[in-house]
């Protein structure tokens, strides 16, 4: 009987791992997870170009944060406001990367928008996710994101 239970459990583990059920994903220590992506708030202030380079150095595939839903925005706001209070964070959106079309610095489509203005580099307010244009050389906080 014990052997039957052991074999049955082993088959269940193999089935679940092959089917992807319960297979989940893990973010590195200090990173938050949402919808198979990992996020981290950094308290350093940098200009947009240095911030994007910084994110790329933090983890393979990491870039400045991109938003694709209001739920994703809610998660990032819940992580940034307690740490940064009333301030701004760079988003991975600027004309530096693509003069003709708007896309995130990670190459994904700009499919969620909350514009308040337009310029070369875009920030998000930590309190209400209002998007604002800022001079790319100004120094702002950083949120990095990568797909797990």
Swiss-Prot record:
What GO molecular function annotations does the UniProt record carry, in alphabetical order? carbohydrate binding; toxin activity
What superkingdom heads the lineage? Eukaryota
Record keywords, A-Z: Disulfide bond, Hemostasis impairing toxin, Lectin, Platelet aggregation activating toxin, Secreted, Signal, Toxin
An example of a Gene Ontology cellular component annotation for this protein is:
extracellular region
The primary site where this protein sits is secreted
Alphabetized PROSITE patterns for the sequence: C_TYPE_LECTIN_1, C_TYPE_LECTIN_2
UniProt-listed InterPro entries = C-type_lectin-like, C-type_lectin-like/link_sf, C-type_lectin/snaclec_domain, C-type_lectin_CS, CTDL_fold
Q: Which cysteines are joined by disulfide bonds?
A: 27-38, 55-144, 121-136
SMART domains associated with the record: CLECT
Q: Does the keyword Calcium apply?
A: no
Q: Which Pfam families match?
A: Lectin_C
Q: Does the keyword Cell cycle apply?
A: no
UniProt record similarity statement: Belongs to the snaclec family.
Per UniProt, subunit arrangement is: Tetramer of 4 heterodimers of alpha and beta subunits; disulfide-linked.
Q: What is this protein called?
A: Snaclec jerdonuxin subunit beta
Protein's organism: Protobothrops jerdonii
């Amino acid at each position: 009987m014990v052997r039957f239970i052991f074999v049955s459990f082993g088959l269940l583990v193999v089935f679940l791992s092959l089917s992807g059920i319960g297979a989940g994903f893990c973010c590195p220590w200090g990173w938050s997870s949402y919808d198979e992506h990992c996020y981290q708030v950094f308290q350093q202030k940098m200009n947009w170009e240095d911030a994007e380079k910084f994110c790329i150095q933090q983890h393979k595939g990491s870039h400045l944060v991109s938003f694709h839903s209001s739920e994703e925005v809610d998660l990032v706001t819940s992580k940034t406001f307690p740490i940064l209070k009333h301030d701004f964070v760079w988003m991975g959106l600027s004309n530096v990367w693509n003069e003709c079309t708007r896309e995130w610095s990670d190459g994904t489509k700009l499919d969620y928008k909350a514009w308040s203005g337009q310029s070369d580099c875009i920030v998000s307010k930590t309190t209400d996710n209002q998007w604002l244009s800022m001079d790319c050389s100004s120094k702002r906080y950083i949120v990095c994101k990568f797909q797990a």
